Amino acid sequence: MAKYLSTKTYGHNIGLSAVFRQPNAVHSHCHLLHGYSLQFKFTFGCSELDNKNWAVDFGGLKPLKAWLEDSFDHKTCVDVNDPHKQDFYDLQDKDLCEVREFEGVGAEKFAEHAWRFADKLVREMTDNRCWCESVECAEHGANSAIYTPFITQKISMAE
């Protein structure tokens, strides 16, 4: 369990404007293309601080920002199992979009994909002293999803 937590946010204002659709949401308008300027909040944990009393040196996170930009900045995010995947590649061939394929799309899956990249990066940067506790991906002010691989305990409000 982490003794120290620190957070880094890449806000809606940096322009991670991604478009995607939920191919399995046939009951909802979410099966249609729609997009957001995504926001990502990373929570990092560690048991010991470095010699500067930091959990994570945020200056070393440039590869994380570059990955976010390459994955989401003016990108069309497509589920690998989307039955219309080729249509998006046809648009890309006409220079009408840039496709990025993911094993699942949407705020929950984007948070998971970002966590996987960030956790590997931070562990390498710190010789496993730090890790990524969670990632929150927000579509806008009202909708977000959080991914954490760590076990969480549900407590009753009566306790």
Q: Model-found features: residue ranges?
A:
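Charge-rich, low-complexity N-terminal segments
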Residues: 1-159
